[in-house]
């Protein structure tokens, strides 16, 4: 044997000591010699650790605690006893960052030398904040055993792949859950312990169901207890995913397994994966399928499919982004660089500790720019601390040694050392010596010429190098001079601006320094009191623009998250200006104590005037040795960002307050400034609590180094992590190309005109194992949570938005939301997506967890979003991203005035936000009505963007069915309509596909906007309009051109198809008689229909803005369409029929409620009746049947208070008698029988003059149903549009006109092969019978009140009919009034041949049957 390794004989002496020497600790990994098999030796260490040893835990400043430490049986965590934390007294091996030997930690440094034997001491650094567990063992052998064993375990964890880590984590979580549930420690769980565990896991199951699963899992002679293996089987039964099972059925042709071909289709169509082969799918089956029988047959069952989707392959984060994938050869100024502020501090800015460990932590966390504040120390040794405060001090030498050790452990990209130099020239030379001696070759000392200062080097060129950022002597100083004067105005040390000593040294001014620090601390305390009284959240630093206006801000209401910063920039119309010393000058309305203001400006002190004079010529002495170490990162003072930079090798530092002023006043110039050189942003000096500001506005302006306080975990640090995780966490993220070249205004409403935007469609499907809030008072014994999900987009101000789902009551284990959220993003390259889970509470909401990631890091398809810091908690979503062209605007309506959120506030809010606002007026009113949205329904949200043009999916396959080709060009923009007729802003959103829904619809919303009806193809003509100088819309064949789409499954006809009356030419003519004014807007062919959100995800396209109509179109009601993202093809195929006539995804997944659209047809009011009557019948195309279409032979229903969505017709002139229903007999005589999709009659204005009021099905009485009998079979029909209902023949006394005949003809006739009709999609005869029954909704209204209102309505209608019957031949028709709020769904009607009515009326006086309108 050769080499430095000892002989096997020598191993008998001090085996553990020898093993520790072999295990070389290099940056968190273990380097082993391939010549040695160390398994038995390591096992001895593991055995000794599992047996446990007594050691002393040091806390610093007090006596140590004697505890018994041991490694648990799964080797997953270190535990100790005794402890008041009970089962929580543990440190996970996964959380350990480093194990160091000897007295190296800051805690050991507090004890005098000689207190402990260094060979018996070691420290364990763990957690996100690098907390240290400092232990003293009884002997050096014990210390070596623990250090060796822990390093070995850490090495194994670092080497395992992500899949093995996820499976190991799950196994450990199951074992830990089992142990914690085993209260009596007998190794098994009783039914009582299981019920307690289910409550802890937020599972709300009936006891009988739990007992049944318990009996099924209890397989060992049914002893009434569950062992660990039985518990795993029980948990597996309990956690079977219905959503994944339905998803699997879709792609397996309704089988309970997926073969390789089906799995390949799923990965290609849904997950948008390229290059998927059958061999790779077979490998997935082999890897994830737990059942040996399925594995041998090459099948993936539900368990294997669940394992795959919950593996890293199903995570929302792109696995390629775990590694560096961006171009790293661009100049440094083209990258965002993660930076730390006052890196050495572990707490606040005034009195906390300074530790060298913080440098090790932030560098290993990916930070590439650290700050070192250098001051003169005793004995000629420079020290590091926060100047003029009471923070502790550490040696500059120790800091540099730590940086040298940990700088390039995680990656080799350059580290920038930001030195804030306050030392004398003598100690500056000492600093330069330490930097040169310790860093050595890592220090970039390459000889570069100032002539090359036009371009910065790239991160790739500077790999493994440390750059010193600091002041540099000017070129006009002699090279022989060892020192020189430089400006001190570029200092980024904020607090010394108020505290810098003018005369004397620190010893003579010690009292003044302490007073300044105490005054700052006092201001912090008083500010906290003001926050508590004036606002529940912290203030934020903000500035006013010169005009005094806020301008465009981002979110004012941030979320109160656990452990996050708190604050808001605007409350109740007040702007809190975050500068203590400048509140009076800014005109703040909050009255602060005078002591906070005094002294900061130094106006009352004798030195205040001299200080102001000194600032005009603030200079300092700089050593030549230290100056020569600065190459590419020279610190300079910047007074005007519009001036051309003299060199790119310089860095300008701005406080957040100054940077905000620049952002508000000169955003485009600031962006250009950051293209030429580096800039660094640091927190305000008044963030003495080490809170963080929002970094996103500065990233929007291209600022490279946005320094944050890494010791303050919270929202802002989470945004920072998400930003830099997009490139492997290397600390460098490439800026978008538009930020590196060209100029744009990041604060404008359309920052990049002409460029494609992204539409993000997120379907929040379900959640898994969501825990109780961490700060819950009752802990695991608290109530089962009521979760909802909030999604936030953080980017440019125009992109910042948030949406949220409804609340699911009493289910945190597997809640199902099935809701679709849509976002528009102008610049996705810098946008972040933030998922938050909240627990709804009557008095607020509690934070459960979050996950933030870059927009570019999201994977499409069905993905799991694992909450940060939680082992099993996740939400299941579907992600779809499309390209959007055209302008985007918010659709506003009357409901939006009540339900939309507060006006966005300042982007600079450094806090998670404030508690949610009180319910709006409309929400409080609606809660008191019978049909009000309940707690389980979706809260009010802002409107979805309303699109002018279509979408184009960025995916290749699988989405071709779900898109609408964009139009040929931008359409004229119409003003937003507000009022009762417009929908709620949260209810309208762009539609990416048009697909008919089945007759089963929801009773949730009544949409009223008519869509363009079918019309004949007119000759190509260009509509002209002089209104406001609008350009004519393109017509002719070119106007109907659509971008080609790829079909994935079903073949489609590539020829243009008429849709909503659009002919081949696609030309539209404006309706004769309509006025050319601002209210009349042209319709466009490329207009994307706007849909209305309902609970079950049914969408109804509304009429595009404007007054243009197809030639001679009779205004039929639109068909019901579904959203591609809200109702994907896979859900449409879940019904046994297998056709498109299936319910939408959320109907099948989350709700049995149905939606009916009662879009009322416009009968041409305001149009020329002669023009309508003269339209030739033969030119009218067929009208598709629709469950939502009302019979157009009846006039519209009057608007009611309880249903403001219906269009108000009270302002219209009365309808003449010629618009009464006409007989269908002449036209029906020669027509073949066709099964209708469904018809629903509406009571007209003349029939029901009294405003109808809302009533749910649960309130109907027997009097509300008028039975009629079908001829032959005498089948009972409740006269509500059920199958079997017959139509009465109009008597001879009813006048006929062309308009009514056209409307009747469109209602009953349907052209064969018309693909726009829902009935043409199914086989012949389908849908005639067997439709679903009524869906009844409970209500709190009394039946007696309903009868009284129905009686009044009936009497009023009878009076109206008597008046109408005066001009008729024969007795008036006897009809019922509309009961208040009656609702019904005409699932499937029948159009039989005319037959005599069997009602009370005689044949001669029979009129058209008016069915009861049942609506919410």
Swiss-Prot record:
Q: Which organism is it from?
A: Homo sapiens (Human)
Q: Where is the composition biased (Basic residues)?
A: 581-592
Q: Which reaction does it catalyse?
A: a 1,2-diacyl-sn-glycero-3-phospho-(1D-myo-inositol-4,5-bisphosphate) + H2O = 1D-myo-inositol 1,4,5-trisphosphate + a 1,2-diacyl-sn-glycerol + H(+)
- Catalytic-site annotation from UniProt: 341, 385
What cystine pairs are annotated?
none
Annotated protein name in UniProt: 1-phosphatidylinositol 4,5-bisphosphate phosphodiesterase eta-2
At the top level, the lineage of the source is Eukaryota
The record lists Ca(2+) 1 as bound by: 182, 184, 186, 188, 193
Which cofactor(s) are needed, names only?
Ca(2+)
Q: Where is the composition biased (Pro residues)?
A: 1011-1021
The free-text tissue note of the record is:
Expressed in retina and kidney.
Q: Which keywords describe this protein according to UniProt?
A: Calcium, Cell membrane, Cytoplasm, Hydrolase, Lipid degradation, Lipid metabolism, Membrane, Metal-binding, Phosphoprotein, Repeat, Transducer
């Amino acid at each position: 044997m050769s080499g430095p390794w000892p002989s096997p004989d020598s191993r008998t002496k001090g085996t553990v000591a020898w093993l520790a020497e072999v295990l070389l600790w290099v940056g968190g990994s273990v380097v082993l010699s391939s010549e040695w098999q160390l398994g038995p030796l390591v096992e001895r260490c593991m055995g000794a650790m599992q047996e446990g040893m007594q050691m002393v835990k040091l806390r610093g400043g007090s006596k140590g605690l004697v505890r018994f430490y041991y490694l648990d049986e799964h080797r997953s965590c270190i535990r100790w006893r005794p402890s008041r934390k009970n089962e929580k007294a543990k440190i996970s091996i996964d959380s350990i960052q480093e194990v160091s030997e000897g007295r190296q930690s800051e805690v050991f440094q507090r004890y005098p030398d000689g207190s402990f034997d260094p060979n018996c001491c070691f420290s364990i650094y763990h957690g996100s904040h690098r907390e240290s567990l400092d232990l003293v063992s009884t002997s050096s052998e014990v210390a070596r055993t623990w250090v060796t064993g822990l390093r070995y375990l850490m090495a194994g964890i670092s080497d395992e792949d992500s899949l093995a880590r996820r499976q190991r984590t799950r196994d450990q979580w199951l074992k830990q859950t089992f142990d914690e549930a085993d209260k009596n420690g007998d190794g098994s769980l009783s039914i009582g312990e299981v019920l307690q565990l289910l409550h802890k896991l937020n599972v709300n199951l009936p006891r009988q169901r739990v007992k049944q699963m318990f009996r099924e899992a209890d397989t060992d002679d049914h002893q009434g207890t569950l062992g660990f293996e039985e518990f795993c089987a029980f948990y597996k039964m309990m956690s079977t995913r219905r959503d994944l099972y339905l998803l699997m059925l879709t792609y397996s042709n309704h089988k309970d397994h997926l073969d390789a071909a089906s799995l390949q289709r799923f990965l290609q169509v849904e997950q948008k994966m390229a290059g998927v082969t059958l061999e790779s799918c077979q490998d997935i089956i082999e890897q994830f399928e737990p059942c040996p029988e399925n594995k041998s047959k090459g099948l993936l069952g539900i368990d294997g499919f669940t394992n795959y989707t919950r593996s890293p392959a199903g995570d929302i984060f792109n696995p390629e982004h775990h590694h560096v994938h961006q171009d790293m050869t661009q100049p440094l100024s083209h990258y965002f660089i993660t930076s730390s502020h006052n890196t050495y501090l572990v707490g606040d800015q005034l009195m906390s500790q300074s530790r060298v460990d913080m440098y090790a932590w932030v560098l290993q966390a990916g930070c590439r720019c650290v700050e070192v504040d250098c001051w003169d120390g005793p004995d000629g040794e420079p020290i590091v601390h926060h100047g003029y405060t009471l923070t502790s001090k550490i040696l500059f030498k120790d800091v540099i040694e730590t940086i040298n050790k940990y700088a390039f452990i995680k990656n080799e990209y350059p580290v920038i050392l930001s030195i804030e130099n306050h030392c004398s020239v003598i100690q500056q030379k000492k600093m330069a010596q330490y930097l040169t001696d310790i860093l050595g070759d890592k220090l970039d000392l390459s000889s570069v010429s100032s002539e090359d200062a036009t371009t910065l080097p790239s991160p790739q060129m500077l790999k493994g190098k440390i750059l010193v950022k600091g002041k540099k002597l000017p070129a006009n100083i002699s090279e022989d001079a060892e020192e020189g004067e430089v400006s001190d105005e570029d200092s980024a040390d904020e607090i010394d601006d108020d505290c810098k000593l003018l005369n004397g040294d620190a010893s003579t001014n010690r009292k003044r320094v302490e007073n300044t620090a105490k005054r700052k601390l006092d201001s912090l305390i008083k500010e906290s009191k003001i926050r508590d009284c004036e606002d529940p959240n912290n203030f934020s630093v903000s500035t006013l623009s010169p005009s005094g206006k806020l301008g465009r801000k981002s979110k004012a209401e941030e979320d109160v998250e656990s452990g996050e910063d708190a604050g808001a920039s605007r409350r109740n119309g007040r702007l809190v200006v975050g500068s203590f010393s400048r509140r009076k000058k800014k005109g703040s309305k909050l009255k602060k104590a005078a002591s906070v203001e005094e002294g900061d400006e130094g106006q009352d002190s004798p030195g205040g005037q001299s200080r102001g004079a000194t600032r005009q010529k603030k200079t300092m002495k700089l050593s030549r040795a230290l100056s020569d170490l600065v190459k590419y990162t020279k610190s300079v003072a910047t007074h005007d960002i519009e001036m051309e930079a003299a060199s790119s090798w310089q860095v300008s530092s701005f406080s957040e307050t100054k940077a905000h002023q620049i952002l508000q006043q000169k955003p485009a110039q600031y962006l250009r400034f950051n293209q030429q050189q580096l800039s660094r942003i640091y927190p305000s000096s008044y963030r003495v609590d080490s809170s963080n500001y929002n970094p996103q506005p500065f990233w929007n302006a291209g600022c490279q180094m946005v320094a944050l306080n890494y010791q303050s975990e919270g929202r802002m640090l989470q945004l920072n992590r998400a930003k830099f995780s997009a490139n492997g966490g290397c600390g460098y993220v490439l800026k978008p190309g538009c930020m590196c070249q060209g100029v744009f205004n990041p604060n404008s409403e359309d920052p990049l005109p002409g460029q494609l935007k992204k539409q993000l469609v997120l379907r929040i499907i379900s959640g898994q194992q969501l825990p109780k809030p961490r700060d819950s008072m009752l802990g695991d014994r608290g109530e089962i949570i009521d979760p909802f999900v909030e999604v936030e987009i953080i980017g440019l101000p125009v992109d910042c938005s948030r949406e949220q789902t409804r609340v699911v009551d009493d289910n945190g284990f597997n809640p199902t939301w099935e809701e679709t959220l849509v976002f528009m993003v102008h610049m996705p390259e810098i946008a972040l997506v933030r998922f938050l889970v909240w627990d709804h509470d009557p008095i607020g909401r509690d934070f459960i967890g979050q996950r933030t990631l870059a927009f570019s890091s999201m994977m499409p398809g069905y993905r799991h979003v694992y909450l940060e810091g939680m082992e099993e908690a996740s939400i299941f979503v579907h992600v779809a991203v499309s390209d959007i062209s055209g302008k985007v605007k918010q659709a506003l309506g009357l409901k939006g005035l009540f339900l939309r959120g507060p006006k966005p506030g300042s982007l600079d809010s450094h806090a998670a936000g404030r508690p949610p606002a009180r319910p709006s007026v409309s929400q409080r009113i609606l809660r008191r009505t019978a049909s009000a949205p309940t707690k389980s329904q979706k809260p009010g949200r802002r409107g979805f963007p309303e699109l002018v043009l279509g979408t184009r999916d960025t995916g290749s396959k699988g989405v071709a069915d779900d898109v609408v080709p964009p139009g040929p060009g931008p359409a004229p923009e119409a003003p937003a309509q507000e009022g009762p007729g417009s929908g709620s802003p949260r209810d309208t959103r762009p539609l990416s596909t048009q697909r008919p829904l089945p007759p089963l619809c929801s009773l949730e919303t009544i949409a009223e906007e008519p869509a363009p009806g079918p019309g004949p193809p007119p000759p190509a003509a260009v509509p002209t309009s002089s209104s406001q100088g609008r350009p004519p819309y393109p017509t002719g064949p070119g106007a109907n051109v659509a971008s080609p789409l790829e079909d994935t499954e079903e073949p489609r006809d590539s020829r243009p198809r008429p849709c909503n009356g659009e002919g081949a030419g696609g030309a539209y003519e404006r309706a004769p008689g309509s006025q050319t004014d601002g209210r009349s807007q042209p319709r466009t062919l490329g207009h994307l229909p706007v849909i209305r959100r309902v609970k079950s995800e049914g969408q109804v396209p509304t009429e595009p803005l404007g007054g243009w109509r197809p030639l001679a179109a009779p205004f039929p009601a639109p068909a019901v369409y579904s959203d591609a993202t809200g109702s994907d093809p896979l859900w449409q195929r879940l019904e046994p029929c297998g056709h498109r006539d299936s319910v939408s995804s959320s109907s099948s997944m989350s709700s049995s409620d149905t939606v009916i659209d009662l879009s009322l047809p416009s009968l041409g009011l305001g149009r020329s009746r002669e023009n309508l009557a003269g339209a030739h019948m033969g030119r009218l195309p067929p009208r598709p049947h629709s469950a939502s279409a009302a019979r157009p032979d009846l006039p519209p229903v009057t608007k009611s208070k309880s249903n403001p969505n219906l269009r108000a017709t009270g302002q219209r002139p009365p309808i003449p008698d010629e618009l009464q229903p006409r007989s269908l007999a002449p036209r029906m005589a020669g027509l073949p029988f066709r099964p209708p999709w469904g018809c629903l009659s509406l009571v007209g204005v003349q029939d029901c003059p009294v405003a109808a009021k809302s009533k749910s099905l649960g309130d109907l009485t027997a009097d509300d149903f008028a039975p009629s009998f079908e001829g032959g079979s005498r089948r009972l029909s409740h006269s509500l549009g059920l199958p079997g209902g017959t139509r009465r023949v109009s008597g001879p006394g009813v006048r006929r006109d062309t308009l009514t005949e056209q409307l009747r003809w469109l209602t009953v006739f349907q052209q064969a092969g018309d693909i726009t009709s829902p009935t043409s999609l199914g086989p012949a005869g389908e849908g005639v019978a067997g439709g679903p029954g009524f869906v009844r909704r409970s209500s709190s209204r009394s039946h007696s009140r309903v009868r009284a209102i129905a009686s009044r309505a009936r009497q009023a209608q009878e009076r109206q009919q008597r008046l109408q019957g005066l001009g008729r031949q024969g007795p008036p028709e006897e009809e019922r009034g509309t009961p208040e709020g009656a609702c019904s769904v005409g699932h499937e009607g029948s159009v039989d041949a005319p037959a005599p009515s069997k009602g009370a009326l005689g044949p001669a006086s029979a009129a058209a049957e008016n069915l009861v309108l049942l609506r919410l």
